[in-house]
């Protein structure tokens, strides 16, 4: 039996293309169910695809019918043998700290006819109340009239450069088709530092300074002195008088 030797470079590229196509497919299928991302875990026996969403019950469907349909579609689309892939639905821990969920929420608010400024301030307030350190919402397109422009709404702290951006900044981009044209939505959320790693990265920022409380020193039982001096010279002995 011939074994196909695939180089590491081709394997990494293939895994990246698979995840990108899978993410695009699930974004179209589960946009109304609060889809917030996908994670692929490969085990020796099978591959596990974890779908993160805000409404997991809608992703699963009645008696797991919809998740089985998605599994069948993924197997046919990517030529995966049966019983070698399993789909799971995981609920997003904090919806306000997920940029994809907030971008979709803003998208449906604009489709519903809500004013741009009011919709953006509502999303901004919800993100900050969820514990984010900062957020930025940008809406661009034909907001008023025929001339395109962009509106930016900022609150809190936001970093724009350096390696911590990869860990602390969550970004999402969406497009919404309205009567006047297509609007672009960009949401950036600055995550907080979380030692447990639930709501943010475990690794602190390079400029973060942690001040620890001083330890309580036990009270001394005997009086002591920090001044260290030489031992005192012996006192001169009295000399007896000679008669």
Curated annotation (Swiss-Prot):
Keywords assigned: Ribonucleoprotein, Ribosomal protein, RNA-binding
One MF annotation (Gene Ontology) recorded for this entry: RNA binding
Top-level taxon in the UniProt lineage: Eukaryota
Pfam families named in the record: KH_2, Ribosomal_S3_C
Region (Disordered): 195-243
CDD domains: KH-II_40S_S3
Keyword Transmembrane helix attached: no
Gene Ontology CC annotations of this record: cytosolic small ribosomal subunit; nucleus
Family annotation (SUPFAM superfamilies): Prokaryotic type KH domain (KH-domain type II) (SSF54814), Ribosomal protein S3 C-terminal domain (SSF54821)
InterPro entries assigned to the protein according to its UniProt record, in alphabetical order: KH_dom-like_a/b, KH_dom_type_2, KH_sf_prok-type, Ribosomal_S3_C_sf, Ribosomal_uS3_C, Ribosomal_uS3_CS, Ribosomal_uS3_euk/arc
GO biological process, one term: positive regulation of apoptotic signaling pathway
Domain KH type-2 residue range list: 22-93
Membrane spanning stretches: none
PANTHER family xrefs: 30S/40S RIBOSOMAL PROTEIN S3, SMALL RIBOSOMAL SUBUNIT PROTEIN US3
Family recorded in the similarity comment: Belongs to the universal ribosomal protein uS3 family.
Protein name: Small ribosomal subunit protein uS3
